[in-house]
């Protein structure tokens, strides 16, 4: 059974850093991960089985481009299922940095387990124990890297995430500390790992006849606070442009109105933009000292008949 293993080269420029794993054929059957090695909000672990089936529809394709790579799970599964294909993992969230520091994360969690001792699982951590936790985490931050997203799953209430020390200090702690080390052996092997704007990547590879785009953007209408991006409606719609004329696998959510919007536009193709040329007035309303919203009024008169 042939699989691809990788050696690493890095190419750096002021704005873009790429990390390419060059293919090297060896005789070894590697582990296939069914979930990302480190926690990642929105990874497609529940879709793994179905995704493998869908990949069989693209047996004639030779290049798979994971435009919104996230945790890299889709890229990893694709390479394991199609070792003959080129798989591009666009690591826009720098998940690779978290993997490279997995030993530091494991050491930090082991130290926190020693501090917590036999304290009951899932109980709130307060007082001197909480301060000891914070002191150990601060020490780690001064000497290197802290994976706050992974740390959050061991300390915070389910669904809560901190992205820095300041956010972590403001949240309640619970004894949910993972009892074993994280492992990521071979997870990125065989992948070409890059970091580009997805539009640039789509333009580069869209000219190849054997390409398939794997498209898992942030979901419209859902929490995207853990992503390293801030999206508006136009950004979600821009993603649809890369789908036109290319084979693709696209992911969205039942909470997202994007499919309803596309269906409506198909049923009303001639409407255009009803707000084109309209006047606009805005009003900012403040709910409290740190929360406000903006109301918008649009107005447009029709030409009077002669």
Question: Predicted segments — roles?
Answer:
Residues 65-78, 89-93, 153-158, 207-223:
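Conserved proline-anchored active-site loop of SAM-dependent methyltransferases
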Residues 1-4:
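Hydrophobic alpha-helical signal peptides and transmembrane signal-/tail-anchor segments
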Residues 86-188, 301-306:
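Class I S-adenosyl-L-methionine-dependent methyltransferase module
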Residues 173-179, 229-240:
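Well-ordered, non-membrane alpha-helical segments in soluble/globular domains
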Residues 194-236:
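Active-site segment flanking the S-adenosylmethionine/decSAM binding pocket
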């Amino acid at each position: 059974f042939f699989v691809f293993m990788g050696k690493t080269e890095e190419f750096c420029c002021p704005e873009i850093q790429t990390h390419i794993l060059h293919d090297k054929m060896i005789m070894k059957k590697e582990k296939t991960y069914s979930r990302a090695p480190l926690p990642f909000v929105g990874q497609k672990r529940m879709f793994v089985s179905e995704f493998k089936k869908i990949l069989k529809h693209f047996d004639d394709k030779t290049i798979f481009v994971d435009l919104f790579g996230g945790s890299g799970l889709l890229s990893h599964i694709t390479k394991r299922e199609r070792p003959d294909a080129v798989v591009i993992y666009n690591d826009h969230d720098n998940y690779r940095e978290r993997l490279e520091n997995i030993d530091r994360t494991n050491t930090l969690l082991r130290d926190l387990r020693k501090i917590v001792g036999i304290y009951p699982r899932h109980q709130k951590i307060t007082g001197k124990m909480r301060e000891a936790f914070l002191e150990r985490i601060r020490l780690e931050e001064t000497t290197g890297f802290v994976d706050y997203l992974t740390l959050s799953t061991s300390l915070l209430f389910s669904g809560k995430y901190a992205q820095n020390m300041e956010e972590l200090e403001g949240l309640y702690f619970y004894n949910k500390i993972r009892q074993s080390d994280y492992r990521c052996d071979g997870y990125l092997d065989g992948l070409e790992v890059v970091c580009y704007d997805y539009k640039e990547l789509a333009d580069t590879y869209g000219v190849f006849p054997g390409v398939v785009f794997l498209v898992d953007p942030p979901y419209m209408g859902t929490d995207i606070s853990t992503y390293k991006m801030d999206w508006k409606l136009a950004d979600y719609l821009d993603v649809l442009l890369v789908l036109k004329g290319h084979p693709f696998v696209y992911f969205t959510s039942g909470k997202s109105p994007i499919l309803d919007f596309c269906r409506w536009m198909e049923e009303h193709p001639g409407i255009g933009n009803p707000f084109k040329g309209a006047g606009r007035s805005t009003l900012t309303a403040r709910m409290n000292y740190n929360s406000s919203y903006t109301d918008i009024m649009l107005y447009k008169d029709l030409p009077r008949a002669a």
